[in-house]
Structures are given as C-alpha cells and as structure tokens.
C-alpha cells in the first residue's frame, strides 16, 4: 500500500507537471501581444493641441474603435494638409476581442512613443497601426517602413537545404494568400500552415494589408529579405505596412 506521504508526493508531481504543460501550451502558441517596433515619421512634422489635425485624428480613433475588428481597416478624414490617414490590421488569426484589445494597445503605444507626430507606425505581435498625412494609392508598396526579427539560435543540420525548403513553403503560402475568397468578395490576403522538414516541423504564416493590389509581389519581396537577415535561423519574420511573413519551429498560430 502507498503511504500518505508517497501519495502526497505523487499529487504534487502531477500538479507541477500540469502547470508545466499549461505554461508550455500557452507560450508555444504565442498568445501574448508583445511590442515589436515603432517608427516616428518625423518628416511629416508635429501637430498642435486642439488643431484640426488632432480633431481628425481623434475622430478616426473613436470611429475605428466601434468596429468588431474582424479584419483590417483604412479610413481617412479631413482635407490636406489636415487629413489623418489610418492603416490598421490585425494578424490573420487574431480577431474579435483580441483584435480590439490590440487596437487599444497600439493607439496608446503610438501616443506615448511618438507624441504629437502626424505620422507614426507601431507594430505588436497581434497587429500594427500606421497614422500618416499621406494617403498612398493601393498600387504602391511600402518597402521603406519594414524591419526584420529572428531567433538567435541556428538550426541543426543542413542550413542550405532548410533555407530552400522554408522559402519554398512560404512561396506556397503566398500563392494561397493571393487567391480569391470562396464567396468572391476579394482575395484572402492571409495564409498559414505547417510542414514537416526532416526532424523539424515548420509553422509559417503570410499576410498582406487589405488596401494593396499586388499581395503576391509584396510577399515575394519579403521572403527574399529573409535571405539578407535570417539565413539558417530557427525562426524569423519580416514585417512592414504592406505585408509580412513569419516562420517558426514552434506553434504560434491560432486555429
């Protein structure tokens, strides 16, 4: 028979194991909304308190906050030079309250990090927000406001083979993102999936903002950028205001 002390030790072990599994499950799915990067567009200047630009900006912030956040948004208000243009988009697997929470975080973060700048961009794990005085046409890709991040660890094994297969998989996802929706209302602009690469399982996603015409072109450019920053890394991403790509060796996509 088990003694009460042995039984107690077993219960403690099960409890600790359960906590570890829960922590691993949460962290592996990347359910956080970490701050990633920001950029103040200093060339667009600053606005004064209670100016027409600030009124337009506050109107847009309040207007967008009333949506249900199922996809990205692009709105403008006022006439130049006091127009405020928004590009806001959540990650393809972040929607509803998660997206709304990220929007509130992004607005607060932008006000704090780029105080009174007319133009600014901020990226979080679940969304990004861009405010600008310039209303770019949908045919123009924004390759200037981009950045990359990568896992500090390198993969084990054949780096060249991994890089090639990883890029091929991202190109496959880019083709899927550029296909029409089932209801014919537009392109998907988002694709994610997994692929077995030897002993590793690759998790990846690609996404374009809903205001551009050439999604596939933008994604292909971002995939090529991975070669400049992140060869052989266990995970990496290239983010911008037109599109982004990401891959990891752990699950980070909501299903």
Swiss-Prot record:
Localization: Secreted
Name of the encoding gene: CRRSP32
Protein's name according to its UniProt entry: Putative cysteine-rich repeat secretory protein 32
Entry GO terms, CC: extracellular region
UniProt keyword list: Repeat, Secreted, Signal
Signal peptide boundaries: 1-28
Top-rank taxon: Eukaryota
CDD domains: Gnk2-like
Organism encoding this protein: Arabidopsis thaliana (Mouse-ear cress)
Location of the Gnk2-homologous domain: 35-136, 143-252
Protein family: Belongs to the cysteine-rich repeat secretory protein family.
Gene3D superfamilies cross-referenced by the UniProt entry: Gnk2 domain, C-X8-C-X2-C motif
């Amino acid at each position: 028979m088990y003694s009460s002390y042995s039984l107690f030790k077993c219960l403690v072990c099960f409890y600790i194991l359960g906590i570890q599994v829960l922590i691993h499950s949460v962290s592996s799915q990347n359910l956080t909304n970490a701050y990633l990067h920001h950029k103040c567009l200093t060339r667009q200047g600053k606005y004064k308190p209670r100016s027409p630009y600030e009124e337009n900006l506050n109107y847009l912030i309040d207007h967008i906050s009333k949506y249900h956040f199922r996809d990205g948004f692009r709105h403008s208000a006022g006439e130049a030079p006091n127009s405020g243009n928004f590009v806001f988009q959540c990650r393809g697997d972040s929607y509803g309250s998660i997206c709304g929470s990220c929007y509130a975080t992004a607005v607060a973060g932008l006000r704090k990090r780029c105080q009174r700048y007319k133009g600014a961009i901020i990226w979080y794990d679940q969304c990004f927000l861009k405010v600008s005085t310039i209303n770019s046409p949908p045919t123009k890709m924004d390759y200037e406001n981009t950045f990359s991040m990568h896992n500090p660890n390198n993969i084990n094994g054949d780096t060249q083979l991994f890089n090639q297969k990883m890029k091929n998989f991202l190109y496959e996802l880019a083709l899927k993102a550029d296909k029409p929706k089932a209801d014919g209302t537009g392109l998907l602009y988002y694709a994610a999936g997994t692929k077995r690469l030897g002993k590793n399982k690759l998790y990846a996603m690609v996404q374009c903002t809903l205001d551009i015409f050439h999604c596939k072109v933008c994604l292909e450019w971002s995939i090529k950028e991975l070669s400049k920053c992140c060869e052989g890394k266990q995970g990496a991403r290239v983010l911008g205001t037109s599109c982004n790509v990401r891959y990891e060796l752990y699950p980070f996509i909501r299903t």
